[in-house]
Amino acid sequence: MANREGGRRNSGKLRRAKRKVCAFCMDKSEFIDYKDINKLRKYVTERGKILPRRISGNCAKHQRELTRAIKRARNIALLPFTTE
């Protein structure tokens, strides 16, 4: 018969990943500056995509601010839209 667990071997021993803490909340930074390219590059992939919240670990408020800052930096050519 088919395995009802969906192929999982340790079905009863699921382990939750540790929740990442928002780096901007830890620093207690007032706002995210779009001119701080080194900080913004940590949250952009090699392909130029913005990392989602579940990967970056940011809170919702700072993820919105980060997205705005990255888009502003792209518009004034501080960050590239895509890689070459």
Swiss-Prot record:
One of its GO terms (cellular component) is cytosolic small ribosomal subunit. The keyword rRNA-binding applies. Pfam families: Ribosomal_S18. GO terms for biological process: translation. GO terms for molecular function: small ribosomal subunit rRNA binding; structural constituent of ribosome. It comes from the Bacteria. The keyword rRNA-binding applies. Keywords: Ribonucleoprotein, Ribosomal protein, RNA-binding, rRNA-binding. Part of the 30S ribosomal subunit. Forms a tight heterodimer with protein bS6. Belongs to the bacterial ribosomal protein bS18 family. Binds as a heterodimer with protein bS6 to the central domain of the 16S rRNA, where it helps stabilize the platform of the 30S subunit. This is Small ribosomal subunit protein bS18. The lineage of its organism: Bacteria, Bacillati, Bacillota, Clostridia, Eubacteriales. The gene is rpsR.
